[in-house]
Amino acid sequence: TNIQDKPQIEHRGFYHDVTRGRIPTMDYLKKLVDRMAAYKLNQLQLYMEHTFLFAKFSEVWRDDTPLTPEDILELDAYCRKRHIELIPSIACFGHLYKVLRTRTYCHLCELPDMEQEPFGFVDRMKHHTLDVSNPESMQLAKSLIDEFMPLFTSKYFNICADETFDLGKGKSAGL
């Protein structure tokens, strides 16, 4: 009898959104990585918004207890020891609800004067898209990426440019 225990699929990953509900602890994330290794998964995409301590964006995370750059470096090393690639995944176009509600960045929202609008189930797809007609929007996205990406050893990066439901319905309508 010849038994082979080798995965047939090259990329075997898990996409973990840590922006909904409680922010996971490092202990929880390490246990997740250990379970992934036991099942021979080799990629973990960690999706973050306000759950990361961006130095330039304290208005975004100040009411939370975000993961720090040191946490990410530690988790990346922990993953590597278990043959798992930790892949960064952050919102860079849509899903910027908390960023676009701040005094500093509300002017970059596709829909004007939305910073006080409640974020609820019915309107959850509104008022969180960057205004592509404003060059500052690209600078904001670049700033997020520049701060986050160097913490990971992965050759991949997910910019999450999805769910831009407001695009073309406000300031960029004339483009």
Listing of model-derived features with the role each one plays in the protein:
Residues 1-175:
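Feature activates predominantly on carbohydrate-active enzymes
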